Every structure is written in structure tokens, then in C-alpha cells.
């Protein structure tokens, strides 16, 4: 009789308890994944607001693919090695060459953004 009682009452009880524990695992996993994504979005918004408050201009719509395309379009075959000045040397030549390169890259970026 006790064996029959276990089959009728105990087995369904254990099946429900263990089955629901297994099923709740998936519901909780969805909750934790959603919380993680939401937290990352909040952190990203906080970072953007801090950067704009500090005066940095952020580009909108920047993706990994767009950055890869920019890097792939760079002319890496024709470049000039510029040695950085030492502490005892004059910085005027270095600053002049550096400014010329920055102006050239700024013009290229403006042309690409206008197209």
C-alpha cells in the first residue's frame, strides 16, 4: 500500500517540483539577459552624456562595419615616417608636419562626409 501511495502522490509531487525548477531556470535566464542588456544600454547613455558634457563631439550611427571601411580605405602603402622630437630638440618642425597631416586627414574626412 505504501508503494502505491508513493506512485500516486509522491512521484507526481517530485515530478512537478523538479520539472518546475528546471523550467524556472529558463525564465530566470531571460530575466538576467534582459537586465544585462538594459544595464549596458544605461551605461552607454551615461557615457555619452558625460562625453558631451565634457565637450567631446560624438558621431552618430558609427558601427564596426563603418569604422572597418574607413580603415580599409586608408592608403597604408604611401606613408612618411616622422620621428618624434627628443626632450632637448626644437618642436617647431615636428608640430608643423603633424599639423599638415591633421589638416590633410580632416579634409579627407570632410570630403567623405559630404558625399
Curated annotation (Swiss-Prot):
GO terms for cellular component: mitochondrial inner membrane. Signal peptide: none annotated. GO terms for biological process: mitochondrial cytochrome c oxidase assembly. Belongs to the COX16 family. Its main location: mitochondrion. It holds the Pfam family COX16. Required for the assembly of the mitochondrial respiratory chain complex IV (CIV), also known as cytochrome c oxidase. Keywords: Membrane, Mitochondrion, Mitochondrion inner membrane, Transmembrane, Transmembrane helix. This is Cytochrome c oxidase assembly protein COX16 homolog, mitochondrial. Residues 1-6 are mitochondrial matrix. Residues 30-115 are mitochondrial intermembrane. It is a single-pass membrane protein. The chain crosses the membrane at residues 7-29. The keyword Transmembrane helix applies. It is found in: Mitochondrion inner membrane.
Amino acid at each position: 500500500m505504501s508503494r502505491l501511495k508513493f506512485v500516486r502522490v509522491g512521484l507526481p509531487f517530485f515530478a512537478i517540483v523538479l520539472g518546475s525548477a528546471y523550467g524556472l531556470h529558463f525564465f530566470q535566464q531571460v530575466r538576467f539577459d534582459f537586465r544585462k542588456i538594459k544595464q549596458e544600454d544605461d551605461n552607454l547613455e551615461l557615457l555619452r552624456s558625460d562625453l558631451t558634457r565634457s565637450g567631446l563631439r560624438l558621431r552618430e550611427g558609427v558601427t564596426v562595419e563603418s569604422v572597418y571601411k574607413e580603415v580599409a580605405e586608408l592608403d597604408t602603402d604611401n606613408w612618411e615616417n616622422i620621428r618624434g622630437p627628443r626632450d632637448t630638440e626644437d618642436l617647431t618642425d615636428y608640430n608643423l608636419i603633424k599639423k599638415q597631416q591633421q589638416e590633410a586627414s580632416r579634409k579627407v574626412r570632410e570630403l567623405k562626409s559630404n558625399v
